[in-house]
Amino acid sequence: MTLRLWHHLKLRLSPEKATSVYELVDRPLVPVLSQMECLGIKVDRTVLARLSSEFAAQMELLEKEIHGLAGQPFTIGSPQQLGEILFGKMGYKGGKKGKSGQYSTDVTVLEDLAGQGIDIARKVLDWRQLAKLKSTYTDSLQQQIDPKTGRVHTSYSLVGAQTGRLSSTDPNLQNIPIRTENGRQIRDAFVAEPGNVILSADYSQIELRLAAHFADVEPLRDAFEKGEDIHARTALELFGEVNRDTRGRAKTINFSILYGISRWGLSKRLESTADEAQALIDAYFQRFPGISNYIQETMATVRECGHSTTLFGRKTWFPRITSPNQAERQGSERAAINAPIQGTSADIIKRAMVQMGPALKAAGLGHVKMLLQVHDELVFELPEADVAAASDVIRAIMAGAAEPLVKLTVPLGIEIGTGPSWGAAH
């Protein structure tokens, strides 16, 4: 069956202008991924067990506090009981019942309540986060350690994400949370063998760099060329000054714009009014008109052709871009704006992965092992004595991975860290 499909699909590669993506990116990546899956990464079971106990203790404390605020015990993990407590007994506004007759208590609802200063909602969000970390990671990962190797061996898929990004399963190592201290601690359980260290190499702000390339935004290109803090530069352009607050707001705006955020969405992230958020969006587009032009041109192309295209020729299709259903259409529009950027980023790191093994071997570093790929990051294991030499090779390959197929107008920055664990390497 696979061979029959290959004969059929091969005929479509050239007309779809996808030959280079297949021949130079995806096909040569298959043996690389196979080797990474076989290697796996060592996991320290004692770290996971300790974190599981700590999370359980934190959950127990939160449970007591939540029950105290509610005035009665109830099952926090039950959406039905939580909804009745919040909107029935406690009488908070904003409760909406679905077709099942139950109040919605999803993350959006709880974040809205927490944003109003409602303490119980914030504590439930914290409890849920801990429950997720405990069940999905600290407990589940212990069951997925191979008893023969002491390592976990994730499975990668080239077709798991629409934009060309890799996905992983059993376990999914792409979604380990890094925004919270508890989430970051989970990476401490991924460790090197005795005598080795973990090396993390991460593309720095690659999507913003690619946006500057796609949109031909000179101030942003100039900032990246000079190695400036891009969020500080945006803060200066929008607010006229740089401090912790303006830089934080500028960072939120930088990333939000690339995902086609609405003024309502941005107002929630900035905790501002919708009018204030719209004023910032307008100011951003006025200061960086190339971004606005890129968004408009991308939308026009996708509406006309039904797809977007990366710099390498990979197409992402959006069949619902003209849907009469507003929610479906707007969702496709937001995804279409970012797809060329995210897809190009995925193609670049795949190119780096294909070139990495031969380059390390040529430098006498064939024993350096590439273990994981997580979005814009590559994770290696190597002897500590080889860190300096390996870092030079890894940085060079990642920085030049787009060439000669694509000539970027912005440099690709690479951040490298090392340590006894994945967490310590950050």
Placement of each model-derived feature along the sequence:
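Short amphipathic alpha-helices in soluble, non-transmembrane regions
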Residues: 390-398
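Flexible helix-coil linker/hinge segments at domain or subdomain boundaries
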Residues: 400-413
